[in-house]
A protein has these predicted regions:
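Long, well-ordered core segments of solenoidal/helical folds
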Residues: 1-17, 63-81, 122-139
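Loop-centered beta-sheet repeat module
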Residues: 1-45
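A structural signal for long alpha-helical coiled-coils and helix-turn connectors
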Residues: 5, 48-52, 74, 110, ...
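A short glycine-/small-residue-rich loop at the edge of a beta-strand within enzyme catalytic domains
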Residues: 31, 35, 57-64, 89-97, ...
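Acidic/His metal-coordination segments adjacent to aromatic residues that form catalytic metal sites
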Residues: 18-30, 81-89, 147-148
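Oxyanion-binding "anion nests"
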Residues: 39-87
Length: 171
């Protein structure tokens, strides 16, 4: 996990890129794609959860990274509970999978003692945002659309994260 975090970290924003050119260490688009950042959050929480308790130093490092990133991410949450496709670019469209994933991470983080209960209201606002994007037939709209993830639409990944969000057990 540390290797991924170190390679994808964007110093200017404190967020993470989703593509890195290993040949020269550059980031082709340099964007903090919100779903990618949400994957980092859910990965940190889940990895912390499954590491043996005897790995104290590693668990503490994951916890610190998780809490720090969650703090940065929540600054980008919009008033309606959602997030932009590029997390730190308000000119991009509002994306639906991101709040589902971050809500999962908050619910799991609170359950596991990594986050305080005061964050539940923000997670609940994310969940409410996501629910407003669900059509009567169950499809979730305005996710980064499969397979290119370059415009709003639907994706099976988003559908799965919405189910996990509703279970409130973490991703």
């Amino acid at each position: 996990m540390k290797g991924i975090l170190d390679r994808l970290y964007l110093k200017k924003s404190g967020l993470y890129a989703h593509i890195r050119d290993e040949a020269d260490g550059s980031f082709p688009d340099g964007n903090a794609w919100s779903v990618g950042v949400a994957w980092i959050l859910t990965g940190l929480e889940r990895t912390w959860r499954v590491l043996p308790e005897k790995m104290v130093r590693e668990r503490e490092d994951l916890k610190e990274r998780f809490v720090s990133l969650m703090d940065r991410v929540l600054r980008y949450q919009c008033g309606d509970g959602g997030f932009h496709d590029v997390m730190d670019d308000p000119e991009t469209y509002m994306e639906t999978e991101t709040p589902a994933m971050i809500a999962c991470a908050v619910y799991a983080g609170v359950r596991d003692g990594l986050l305080g209960e005061e964050l539940l209201a923000q997670a609940d606002a994310m969940a409410a945002y996501v629910r407003r994007k669900i059509l009567p037939d169950g499809r979730v709209m305005d996710a980064a659309s499969s397979p290119a993830f370059d415009r709003p639409g639907t994706s099976v990944e988003c559908q799965a994260h919405v189910l996990m969000m509703e279970k409130r057990s973490g991703c």
